[in-house]
């Protein structure tokens, strides 16, 4: 999403406020693909669900807000209710409902046994 920004100073922020144990998260990205983010409560350990990281269980119910600051007077802001708690599915839903753009988003995280991230990626 950040790579879709046109100007070097454009910024994208995604905020999720949720009822799950992580409490929410914030991610920012620029047009060059630089991304940083944090979760409100990082020390949450959930058991795997079907052998995979249980992102939906960590988030629970909530709201996702996408803010695009393109240097205009006011930033563009779109908001959707989390549908599944799986971030890729919720971003796909956001694109369809808020921006009316048919899209598919895929994300993956490979975890180490000590609950640290080994690698992550997406499209």
List the predicted regions and their residue ranges.
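Interaction interfaces in information-processing and related assembly proteins
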Residues: 1-123
């Amino acid at each position: 999403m950040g790579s879709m920004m046109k100007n070097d100073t454009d910024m994208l922020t995604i905020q999720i406020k949720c009822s799950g144990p992580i409490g929410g998260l914030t991610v920012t990205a620029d047009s060059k693909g630089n991304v940083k983010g944090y979760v409100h409560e990082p020390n949450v350990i959930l058991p795997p669900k079907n052998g995979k990281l249980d992102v939906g269980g960590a988030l629970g119910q909530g709201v996702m807000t996408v803010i695009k600051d393109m240097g205009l007077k006011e930033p563009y802001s779109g908001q959707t209710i989390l549908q599944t708690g799986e971030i890729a599915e919720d971003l796909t839903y956001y694109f369809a409902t808020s921006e009316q753009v048919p899209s598919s988003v895929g994300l993956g995280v490979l975890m180490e046994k000590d609950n640290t991230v080994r690698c992550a990626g997406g499209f």
